[in-house]
Regions:
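Conserved short acidic donor-positioning loop in nucleotide-sugar-dependent glycosyltransferases
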Residues: 11, 36-38, 64, 73
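Short, well-formed alpha-helical segments that are part of the catalytic scaffolds
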Residues: 11-25
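A conserved acidic beta->alpha catalytic loop
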Residues: 35-44, 94
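Acceptor/aglycone-binding surface of glycosyltransferases and processive sugar-polymer synthases
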Residues: 61-64, 68-79, 98-175, 202-210, ...
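Conserved small/polar residues in nucleotide/adenosyl-binding loops
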Residues: 249-254
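Short beta-strand-to-loop acidic/aromatic patch adjacent to the donor-nucleotide binding site
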Residues: 84-93
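Catalytic donor-sugar/metal-binding loop of nucleotide-sugar-dependent glycosyltransferases
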Residues: 173, 183-200
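Short beta-strand/loop segment that forms part of the nucleotide-sugar
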Residues: 29-38, 58-60
Length: 254
């Protein structure tokens, strides 16, 4: 497999080094880390992994958001990684195990689909805000967008190379970008599948830069904007018309 691992990172600690070490040990040979405007006190992890032959560091001088970080890496791969099977996006806080990352990449290559590494949210160690947020968003996705995705917040996503250009040209610069990516599955008829992964929360997910209020508002704004787009409204009306016709033809005669 020829895979680029993409890790967007803001103010990382030693967990980023642990993630990269585990990837190198697993045999990944191309790891792209995006420094999204980290402050001077948090540059040492980038300097550490930047010395590895497997790693490339891309830098934003100021913080631009996770979405822009992913786009920066996608654009880099389009220019410099032609002929690769694809990329896999990974969080830098050690929540994704190297074995799970490898399994998602294998599934992507075998099935030629986007692969989402999905967690279970019924364990006692899962923070309440993560369980509630994912369950709520999954329900909204299913009801309003017609997408059945069990883990809408997963950062572990293996993406075939041919989709990178599409994902470079969709809206979103921060956490809402990952939601827009999922909505693009339906809009552009992108095939996807889910692969179960280990559910890991370290220090109650304390290292996350996700703002529960501000970022959630942005995410739901994206979902509702999509839900009332002309394409989806047309789909809903078409489905409603089909349902009415079905009722008319299956109702017993008076």
């Amino acid at each position: 497999m020829k895979i680029s691992v993409i890790i967007p990172s803001l103010n990382p600690d030693d967990k980023l080094v642990s993630v990269v070490d585990s990837l190198v040990k697993k045999g990944f040979e191309d790891i792209i880390i995006v420094n999204d405007g980290s402050d001077s006190a948090h540059l040492w992890p980038f300097e550490k992994v930047g010395s590895y032959s497997q790693c490339t560091i891309l830098t934003h001088e100021v913080n631009k958001g996770k979405g822009r970080g992913l786009k920066t890496a996608f654009e880099y791969c389009l220019k410099n990684r032609q002929g690769y099977d694809g990329v896999v996006t990974v969080d830098g806080d050690n929540q994704h195990r190297a074995d799970d990352i490898y399994n998602c990449c294998e599934a992507m290559v075998k099935n030629d689909k986007v692969v989402l590494g999905v967690r279970r949210f019924d364990g006692e160690d899962v923070p309440f805000k993560s369980r509630f947020g994912n369950n709520m968003t999954s329900m909204v996705f299913k009801v309003m967008c017609g997408l059945n995705i069990s883990d809408t917040q997963t950062g572990l996503r293996a993406i075939p190379y041919r989709y990178l250009d599409t994902f470079c040209n969709i809206e979103g610069e921060r956490f809402e970008y990952e939601t827009t990516m999922l909505l693009e599955f339906k809009k552009s008829d992108i095939q996807f599948m889910e692969v179960p992964i280990e559910t890991v929360y370290i220090e109650d997910n304390a290292s996350t830069h996700f703002n529960p209020v501000k970022d959630s508002i942005k995410i739901y704004k994206v979902i509702f904007k999509y839900s009332f787009s002309p394409t989806v409204v047309k789909y809903i009306l078409s489905s409603l018309a089909s349902w009415v016709i079905c009722l008319l033809y299956t109702s017993p005669s008076p």
